[in-house]
Amino acid sequence: MTVLNRMDTLAEDMVADITDSPTGYTGVDGDAQWAAEVRRLAKLRGATILAHNYQLPEIQDVADHVGDSLALSRIAAEAPEDTIVFCGVHFMAETAKILSPDKTVLIPDQRAGCSLADSITPEDLRAWKDEHPGAVVVSYVNTTAAVKALTDICCTSSNAVDVVASIDPDREVLFCPDQFLGAHVRRMTGRENLHVWAGECHVHAGINGDELGERARANPDAELFVHPECGCATSALYLAGEGAFPADRVKILSTGGMLDAANTTSARKVLVATEVGMLYQLRRAAPQVDFQAVNDRASCRYMKMITPAALLRCLVEGADEVHVDPGIAAAGRRSVQRMIEIGQPGGGE
């Protein structure tokens, strides 16, 4: 449903410049005129705009709220607006819909997928459960609604260790989909009956241990902020354990944890191992700190599909709307609620 009328010539002209391609919508600059028009259209639609930490800077700047996916989904549920525009990847918008079933949830480009969420399907999970009857399924929030619906308890990167530790030690646990977060949980809990799915985020998996070690040795006074989805998380802990890098300078953190640490660090330089969009929020939080990417090529092409053109189109056309089957949503909601009952989930991812 369009929110334009005959007087909206500026929006009409801007939308007319939009072109579509397999990599996303283009043709509109994220300038001050665009930002003002986005805010005006959001008000007309009665919408609140949420942006993930990995979004383009101009998308983060125009959003009403910026954060990790679970925190944003909880904000969506509490927001007075009836329409949620979720600037992130598709599973994140699904999670917002699960927690806000009566609201309209829009994503600026429904093609914005996620390699990690796509690494396990409902069929995969059903087959895995059949191989391990009676096992407890723990799924990272970075999963589709259909996978959450087959899950016993969801977890975030902040509370994954606590969630697994809360489960009867005699019961098998199936942890999905991220193999690096799963390895971190196994290492921290010492749990031998924890089975880990071999999924990964292509961006985080590409931040390798050799790269991290080289950067760390070249910057001995820096702190390391390492996301547990990274393929280099084990290398970071190894560097600390071997004394190659001070243990108190190595921090395995969710995106929310990184922001908290940025506000308290005494370091003058921090090496950051996560998607490069996170640097924008970190630098805003602590401008006195020199935040540098361990790998400056670690950019998620799916996150960057949420362009200024895509957001403008979304607000004008009311597209793309996110739908989740009510039965799947109810089952997925229960798995998220069980996680919340165990304790505060902290940063989502």
From Swiss-Prot:
Residues holding [4Fe-4S] cluster: C114, C201, C300
Cofactor: [4Fe-4S] cluster
Pfam families: NadA (PF02445)
UniProt-listed Enzyme Commission number(s): 2.5.1.72
Protein's GO biological process: 'de novo' NAD biosynthetic process from L-aspartate
GO molecular function: 4 iron, 4 sulfur cluster binding; metal ion binding; quinolinate synthetase A activity
GO cellular component terms given for this protein: cytosol
Entry keyword annotation includes Membrane: no
Pathway(s) annotated for this protein in UniProt: Cofactor biosynthesis; NAD(+) biosynthesis; quinolinate from iminoaspartate: step 1/1
Top EC class of this enzyme: transferase
Family of this protein: Belongs to the quinolinate synthase family. Type 2 subfamily.
Function: Catalyzes the condensation of iminoaspartate with dihydroxyacetone phosphate to form quinolinate.
Protein name: Quinolinate synthase
